[in-house]
């Protein structure tokens, strides 16, 4: 039996190591306002897009494959009195077909190649969903240097092709028709706030469901490896880029 993302991130609001401060700064840079429309792809528990909707008055449409997360996100929207302009739906974003465009597309930390495949193809998908001069807000892990050591790849359970370096990412965006306005680098504290709730959730599993203790410990070890690799092999960057 495998633990679900719902169980792993039971106590987590945001499912990646990005601070609310960075998200608010990104929203300001994107010039979010009440008439802005946001598409949140892989919305998770929707902390970022709910923050933008609540702060800037934007309208949000989000999609995630996890039904528990979608129900949670919609309940949060209702609690914040945002249901009239914020809605989340349960769909596989890889199969999503939309016939409209948005002012902002957000894709936060899912991993472009893991979800869509080739990086350049992913950016074309985002471009097709944006209005003229639209903004892409993208969170993506980056390698600090290449080649990545075999020890680092093994510890993270990743291939070197999983992610780009910062320079490669910036170059790819430029080639794909995006002008990078700014990027925000996750701090060690951001990562601590990301991994700590997972440790708590897994420790609860280990105490209450002994048959899942080994699986829970593996998950803890995986998150510890991610945290240890920050500043050594990789980090998370939040990009704000304008289509041109």
Residue ranges and their predicted role:
Residues 104-118:
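A short SAM/SAH-binding and catalytic strip from SAM-dependent methyltransferases
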Residues 16-34:
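Conserved alpha-helix/loop element of class I SAM-dependent methyltransferases that forms part
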Residues 36-44:
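Conserved class I S-adenosyl-L-methionine
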């Amino acid at each position: 039996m495998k633990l679900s993302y719902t169980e792993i991130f039971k106590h987590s609001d945001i499912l990646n190591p990005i601070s609310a401060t960075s998200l608010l700064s990104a929203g300001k840079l994107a010039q979010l306002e009440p008439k802005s429309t946001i598409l949140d792809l892989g919305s998770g528990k929707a902390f970022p897009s709910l923050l933008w909707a609540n702060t800037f008055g934007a309208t949000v449409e989000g999609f995630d494959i996890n039904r528990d997360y979608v129900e949670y996100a919609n309940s949060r929207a209702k609690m914040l009195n945002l249901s009239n302009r914020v809605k989340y739906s349960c769909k596989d974003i890889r199969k999503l077909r939309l016939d409209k465009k948005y002012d902002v597309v957000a894709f936060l930390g899912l991993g472009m190649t893991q979800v869509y495949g080739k990086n350049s193809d992913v950016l074309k998908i985002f471009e097709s969903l944006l209005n003229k001069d639209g903004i892409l807000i993208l969170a993506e892990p980056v390698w600090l240097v290449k080649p990545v050591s075999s020890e680092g790849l093994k510890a993270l359970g990743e291939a070197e092709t999983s992610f780009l370096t910062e320079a490669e990412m910036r170059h790819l965006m430029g080639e794909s028709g995006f002008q990078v306005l700014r990027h925000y680098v996750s701090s060690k504290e951001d990562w601590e706030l990301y991994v700590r709730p997972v440790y708590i959730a897994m420790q609860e599993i280990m105490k209450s469901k002994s048959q899942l203790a080994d699986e829970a410990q593996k998950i803890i070890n995986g998150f510890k490896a991610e945290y240890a690799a920050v500043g050594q092999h990789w980090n998370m960057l939040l990009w704000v880029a304008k289509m041109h």
